[in-house]
Regions:
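N-terminal accessory segments that position/regulate proteins before the catalytic core
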Residues: 1-194
Length: 194
């Protein structure tokens, strides 16, 4: 199985790949610009969005640190944070977050049970792996790239939080169900608490 993955995920310098790489890069910029745009009336009214100044200094520092990283690094990750009792989605290079779940205590209680760790008083990073965003353009090589980017984001978050704890061994199916994810096109592979 591993041999097949390595062989199929190699980079092939083909005409199709040469055409698809710039298309993928444009799709990343397009998504960052059009999904959750800064000038949206919903952002301005703060209906589903909250500006960073409403959060703790620690959370703002984490977001500002992440905002210095390349947008492409987050192209196949929906990065959620449990903070202040809610679950919010990080939006690369923006000064606000999307309200993913207002009442996140119930969900984080389930996560705590799965991890045998009380996370209710922590900031929790929940990176959702969405490899299809790269696979559509780069095929199997895109899947390999997505896995590498997922690991890079985890590494950067761990670097930002010196006392962070990484959880990788948990029942993925139950975790994915709790977050309404199919476990194939979208899944949770790791969680970080601080």
């Amino acid at each position: 199985m591993a041999e097949r993955f390595h062989a199929n995920s190699d980079f092939w310098d083909s005409d199709e790949m040469t055409e698809n790489i710039p298309l993928y890069e444009k799709s990343v910029q397009w998504r960052n610009k059009t999904v959750h745009p800064r000038d949206s009336e919903y952002v301005i009214k703060e209906e589903k969005y909250l500006f960073l100044e409403l959060f703790s200094e620690k959370f703002r520092e984490i977001i500002m640190f992440l905002n210095e990283l390349p947008v492409e690094m987050f192209s196949c990750i929906d990065l959620l944070f449990y903070v202040n009792g809610g679950i919010y989605q990080y939006l690369p290079h923006k000064n606000f977050v999307f309200t993913w779940e207002k009442n996140g205590e119930k969900m984080i209680k389930h996560v705590s049970e799965l991890l045998s760790e009380d996370l209710s008083e922590c900031i929790v990073a929940i990176p959702i792996f969405v490899p299809i965003r790269k696979i559509l353009f780069l095929g199997e090589f895109g899947y390999r790239e997505a896995i590498i980017d997922y690991g890079r984001v985890l590494s950067e978050i761990m670097h930002c939080w010196p006392q962070a704890e990484l959880f990788r061994r948990f029942e993925n199916r139950s975790m994915n169900q709790k977050f309404r994810l199919d476990g194939i096109e979208k899944s949770i592979l790791s969680i970080i608490s601080c």
